[in-house]
Curated annotation (Swiss-Prot):
Similarity comment text for this entry: Belongs to the CinA family.
Record organism: Bacteroides fragilis (strain ATCC 25285 / DSM 2151 / CCUG 4856 / JCM 11019 / LMG 10263 / NCTC 9343 / Onslow / VPI 2553 / EN-2)
CDD domains: cinA
SUPFAM superfamilies (alphabetical): CinA-like, Molybdenum cofactor biosynthesis proteins
Taxonomy of the source species: Bacteria, Pseudomonadati, Bacteroidota, Bacteroidia, Bacteroidales
Pfam families associated with the record: CinA, CinA_KH, MoCF_biosynth
Designated name of the protein: CinA-like protein
Classification via InterPro entries: CinA, CinA-like_C, CinA_C, CinA_KH, Competence-induced_CinA, MoaB/Mog-like_dom_sf, MoaB/Mog_dom
Length: 410
């Protein structure tokens, strides 16, 4: 069963608003066996909306439209869909009651808000309990188009409570089963080469996808078929083969973020952690503290961007900085020791590098980052030398620091 998503709004195309709706819909539809094959964004222009709708209705079984249902003049989705389906707008007392309920005590009722009760005559109107814009369900030639509000909270509510259950009742869908493995220590091309024979022999019902992240690769194995038990058995069989090939290079089998894995490991071993960060600017600490309950094992961070902070708060010697430089193995070793001492922790990570876009030299180009991880008296280091732009360099360094710590503590 195939679906297409059409998001409507000039704000999406000029980058003023990020389309999170499509990501959420794709994930939730996939859970019930509906595969999204295309996502299209169009402006608030009637001819462009009609063109997109017509193309999607020809290709897909289900078309999901979001946006353009507000009360202002630039919200033209309802009128445009009426034109496409050859119907007209009529006033709905039931929808008007819902509009009054939603707006009560918040916004005065005026003609624009009352216009929210105008709905297409030839459609199933679905109530929106958290907003004033109703949902329109159209059927044509065995296919379904659903028009929903673009406000994420409203869309997710009506999709979860109304649209997805109705789609499941109307259409027979395949079972889709995913297993995602997070793999470390491999460039994508090297990993693909290692898995080539296994991948070539996969059954037709299975598909493998490579999803690179800075310092990591996620392998998503997807099985699809009418019998869920058979699909799950097939996925499990091939997953076992993959595990035998990659062994300890598999970091996780549930696509769990590394910061959560680190937290679980530290809690299990009753250890405490601190960070000393230069080029990563506190991003490692931010990731660690994004996990609920991290106060059980994380004590704090020293963001030592300037050399004087490295010396005064972390105890890095001026001699090391002058002879080896801030971006050096010796410096991060002293930083990680200083963090453990200052914050009295069992383990720590430290980073110092050149994130870019400027500041590099021939000896130490942009993207050079030294990373250290310490666990009690043990210290290990690594040098990162890949330049993928400032943001990516920082993210990669953060990942590598946490991976290095996990390897040391595990």
């Amino acid at each position: 069963m195939f679906a297409e998503i059409i998001t409507i709004g000039d704000e999406l195309l000029i980058g003023q608003v990020t389309d999170t709706n499509s990501t959420w819909m794709g994930r939730e539809l996939n859970k019930v066996g509906i595969e999204v094959i295309r996502v299209v964004s169009v402006r608030d222009r009637a001819d462009e909306i009609i063109e997109a709708v017509d193309a999607s209705m020809k290709r897909a079984d289900i078309v999901l439209v979001t946006g353009g249902l507000g009360p202002t003049k630039d919200d033209i989705t309802k009128q445009t869909l009426c034109k496409y389906f050859g119907t007209r707008l009529i006033f709905s007392e039931a929808v008007f009651e819902n509009v009054k309920r939603v707006l009560a005590g918040k916004i005065p009722m005026n003609a624009l808000n009352k216009s929210q009760a105008m709905v297409p005559e030839d459609c199933i109107v679905i109530n929106n309990r958290v907003g004033s814009a109703s949902v329109s369900w159209f059927e044509k030639d065995g296919k379904v188009l659903v028009s929903m509000p673009g406000v994420p909270q409203e869309m997710t509510t009506v999709m979860s409570e109304e649209v997805i259950p109705r789609l499941c009742a109307k259409f027979r869908t395949d079972a889709i089963v995913h297993r995602t493995f997070t793999v470390q220590n491999y460039p994508e091309s090297v990993l693909a080469e290692k898995l080539e024979s296994w991948e070539m022999a996969l059954p037709a019902c299975l598909k493998l996808a490579y999803l690179p992240k800075p310092g990591l690769i996620r392998l998503r194995l997807t099985g699809r078929g009418q019998n869920r038990s058979e699909v799950e058995a097939c996925v499990n069989t091939e997953s076992a083969k993959l595990e035998a090939i990659l062994g300890e290079d598999i970091l996780d089998e549930e696509d769990t973020p590394i910061e959560i894995l680190i937290g679980e490991l530290l809690k299990k071993k009753n250890l405490t952690l601190s960070t000393a960060e230069s080029c990563t600017g506190g991003s490692i600490a931010a990731r660690i503290t994004s996990v609920a309950g991290s106060s059980e094992y994380f004590k704090g961070s020293i963001v030592a961007y300037a050399n004087e902070v490295k010396t005064e708060l972390l105890g890095v010697s001026m001699e090391t900085l002058e002879k080896r430089g801030a971006v050096s193995e010796e410096t991060v070793i002293e930083m990680v020791k200083g963090a453990m001492k200052a914050l009295k922790t069992d383990c720590a990570v430290a980073t110092s590098g050149i994130a870019g876009p400027s500041g590099g030299t021939e000896e130490k180009p942009v993207g050079t980052v030294w990373i250290a991880a310490a666990y009690k008296s043990e210290i290990c280091t690594m040098k990162q030398e890949t330049n993928r732009g400032r943001e990516m360099n920082v993210e990669r360094a953060s990942n590598n620091a946490l991976l290095l710590l996990r390897k040391l503590v595990k």
